Amino acid sequence: RHGFPDTLCPGVNKAIDKGIKVVIYDVEIQKCAQRAVQTQQSDAKMASLVLDQMLKDVGTGKPVGYVNVLGIAPLDRRDAVWKDYIAKNQWTQKFMTGKYTPSTATDTAPMVDNALKSNADVVAIYAPYDELTKATLSALGTNPNLKGKVKVYGADISTADIELMSAPDSPWVATGATDPNAIGAAVVRTLALHMAGTVKEGAKEDFPPILVTSEMLRSKNIKNMDDLRKNAPELNISKVSSADWIPAVTF
């Protein structure tokens, strides 16, 4: 799980004091470990891509639902964008629910089910983590009266997510996505650049996401991550945190 500053910062600072180069990913420790190099998905971009699609699909001034868990760095960053879109587009947030556990999808589904039963007028739900998106799909499945009436907007991508999105009549219509393999390679490249002195202490690197829609998956017959990589080569982000002396890696 994502670490917290009070547990991470002492060790990170101790390592840096000893001359060890430290690159962190997707944790918020800049305030207490300012010399570490920060890397992360561009969560603001990930959220805005999806919420722009939601706006296009449902319009302004609509009742919507929200499934998220605060206190986790990337979800907090996506939450900030959500709040901005709520205000700008006059959406009425009818509920916010969600729970982060070892079984997030299973444990959150009943909470979303209860929220839907009390707010059956929502036309869209934003669930910016794929386990929360899965919980939302499960809850909608137990409310057949809402079939075809609620669109779901998520985050992340995997072969399992692709199967859910491309299923017939799936309410999951869009997600913001990066390739975990490509992200891992980019973090390693960032470390190499930091060790070489090109990336300085305290630097920050954001890795850009793309928008994936269910329409795209179906029209291009994308069944898994390999298919998606072939159809969306920009997922590879091979030019991010790169140099001519670092071998290019593709997936």
Model features per residue range: what roles?
Residues 1, 21-26, 38-40, 62-68, ...:
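Structural recognition of the beta-strand scaffold that forms the well-ordered cores
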Residues 1-17, 82, 101-164:
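Hydrophobic alpha-helical
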Residues 10-45, 63, 159-167:
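Flexible loop/hinge segments that line or gate small-molecule binding clefts
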Residues 11-18, 25, 53-61, 85-89, ...:
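Structured segments of extracytoplasmic/periplasmic soluble domains
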Residues 38-64, 77, 105-109, 157-162, ...:
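Hydrophobic alpha-helical segments within soluble ligand-binding/sensing domains
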Residues 48-98, 191, 199-222:
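An alpha-beta-alpha
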Residues 76, 85-99, 124-129, 140-195:
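Extracellular/periplasmic periplasmic-binding protein-like sensory domains
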Residues 179, 187-251:
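Hinge/cleft segment of the Venus flytrap/periplasmic-binding protein
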